[in-house]
Amino acid sequence: MGHHSCCNKQKVKRGLWSPEEDEKLINYINSYGHGCWSSVPKHAGTYTHIHGFCLQRCGKSCRLRWINYLRPDLKRGSFSPQEAALIIELHSILGNRWAQIAKHLPGRTDNEVKNFWNSSIKKKLMSHHHHGHHHHHLSSMASLLTNLPYHNGFNPTTVDDESSRFMSNIITNTNPNFITPSHLSLPSPHVMTPLMFPTSREGDFKFLTTNNPNQSHHHDNNHYNNLDILSPTPTINNHHQPSLSSCPHDNNLQWPALPDFPASTISGFQETLQDYDDANKLNVFVTPFNDNAKKLLCGEVLEGKVLSSSSPISQDHGLFLPTTYNFQMTSTSDHQHHHRVDSYINHMIIPSSSSSSPISCGQYVIT
């Protein structure tokens, strides 16, 4: 840092000011004013009966000594909280322009403001930022969000439930094979139509109904209403059940391919095969893994119909007929349009191994 030209002259004193020097400077400025600071040491240092001997100080040193220590309007003592807040606000605008900041603080010098900033305010701000400011900000935001009104039915307590439903809908719309049992629901029986359970164009399966209200069967604590389904049916894992929560009335509805099951699970299922004994067509009911039964290729399948057990059957093949169960469904919920049908879905799944079916052997379809 360079020195003023007057400081390079000889007989210029540096360092601490003595009380005599302070008195000479105060007496001169009170009598004549400071004017040009470069001329103050010369006039103040003239030997007179008033000022005594000259000051051996440069003009800059006289100015700083007067402004920072000797002026009568100088405000001494600690900074008030109002002054500290004003300094923080001005510093955010002006930065380290201490002289500009000091102009807004009567009686405070730029050097005093700078020292107060570096020694007190800056340290407190840094400590507050690292330890308490972040938590205070989060608490303020939390209280603000807590006090906000719920618009359009939004409630922070239901965010997790809504997110779960949203993700479930994404999974449902993306891959139906990953639907959980909690999403399985069906409309009331009076709105269920065959279109909701479409058959293949080759007529592999058909959704059968009956009007006999006297027949009922209890299974898995669920009641089924007037629904005839082929039996026996397997009990599969509920983690990968398809959903029937919304089935559009579309004749061209394509069912997705469902996962395979081991042979031991489906060994009890019956299949309807067609054989020809000379000119007579026989309806043969065998299981896929029945070693004693005669395994023949599938012939013509009647479109939209299930082969009836009243057709002529050959007793030489050791045949057995599929049985049907009638389950009575009673609604125990106030919501008549949707029911939980986890067990019902289990009884609606039967195998298909018809070579003419678009769904290949070993897969399951919902009838």
UniProtKB/Swiss-Prot annotation:
Highly expressed in flowers. Residues 37-70, 98-121 bind DNA. Residues 9-70, 71-125 form the HTH myb-type domain. GO terms for biological process: plant-type secondary cell wall biogenesis. The keyword Heme does not apply. GO terms for molecular function: DNA binding; DNA-binding transcription factor activity. Keywords: DNA-binding, Nucleus, Repeat, Transcription, Transcription regulation. InterPro entries: Homeodomain-like_sf, Myb_dom, Plant_SW-associated_TFs, SANT/Myb. It is found in: Nucleus. Probable transcription factor that regulates lignified secondary cell wall thickening of the anther endocethium, which is necessary for anther dehiscence. May play a role in specifying early endothecial cell development by regulating a number of genes linked to secondary thickening such as NST1 and NST2. Acts upstream of the lignin biosynthesis pathway. This is Transcription factor MYB26. It comes from Arabidopsis thaliana (Mouse-ear cress).
